[in-house]
């Protein structure tokens, strides 16, 4: 155990290897959900300020960078899964010397990786936006916004990776607190830079840079003040190539999966665009209200990764089995019940998003097509997270990419071949969820780490 005082370990972190399984997973997932909601708040507040104060062109300039930003953040959220898995495993197994080296490795991975992205982004922002077909009327604004935004990459990458460490140690509340604090600063900075100094899209990017930097520094200070062995000491000499390769083994497949799925959504959006303005507006609203279901499922999956990682390290096979059953069966039942309730109250919810009755009616029809089958996504996410918790990320990536990019797009074109409609676009989603859930279940049974884990 490396001679470390376990009382300090208990004092500073939370363990998922003891106590009630279902309560531990749910209480751990709630702060993760809060963090996701605050991240959504960042972009929403930016668009509100820019749209109200600087008009359509400024909003479009930010939107033009949206896919690039989504891909980058999605990739490093995937990398954070890698940090989560191995930090949780070391923590659960009480391999404290390895945990210490891993944390230093994660820190310098974030700093160096973020710096490389910042330089690449600054130099190649015009090239990226050209590839995206950005309209000439907003091109200069989009370049200025993206270049300043890319300056925040060190902070964004470091925050995501170090938050993965804290989640692995069983602490999902601290990242939430710093995310919340960063969100408040983002709103305040938006007001100062946009309403007071009238800085336009540059002000929005600076607000993001400022708030993300504060959140990242907060996480670093928090880790620095912890007791050994999981304190951050900024020591590059303690970095480990082996730990770095372990992070990449899980993190890169998860990150690549996020990017490919994001890119596949361009094809789906192109089909939606052929259905007219009302359909485009309806799906825009749908993708907003869908977050009510989607974000809790993602939070549950993140909690499962930490839960499995810690218990795998500790050798608690029976506890993993119980957590697996609760997350999949309990999560599916809760998802189905929540979706049925949401369908009933959806007409009221939609009034907050649109005043157009045609858009509201079409959005409701889309919800009725997808929500009854959303439990498939819970099954998919939980099986996938279980496998990642075991350190197996490549095959889940293959299943998800083939299902979401292959079967979904194939189903979309088959359904749209005759009498295309928004309902048929919507139907391609549950088809791909069902295929992916079944394939992931088979994959889990065939690739589980021993009979005890099932």
Write out the residue ranges for each language-model feature:
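Hydrophobic transmembrane alpha-helices of multi-pass small-molecule transporters
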Residues: 71-74, 186-190, 216-220, 292-295, ...
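Small-residue-rich hydrophobic transmembrane alpha-helices
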Residues: 59-119, 156-175, 282-346, 377-400
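Residue-level signal for short hydrophobic patches within transmembrane helices
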Residues: 18, 22-41, 45, 68-75, ...
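Short alpha-helical transmembrane segments in multi-pass integral membrane proteins
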Residues: 1-29, 87-152, 196-252, 308-373, ...
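Transmembrane helical elements of multi-pass membrane transporters/channels
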Residues: 27-46, 148, 159, 182, ...
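Short runs within selected transmembrane alpha-helices of multi-pass transporters and secretion channels
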Residues: 80, 148-167, 175-183, 204-219, ...
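Helix-terminus/linker motif at the lipid-water interface of multi-pass membrane proteins
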Residues: 41-60, 129-136, 192-199, 259-292, ...
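Small-residue hotspots at the loop-to-helix junctions and early N-terminal turns
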Residues: 56-67, 146, 205, 277-292, ...
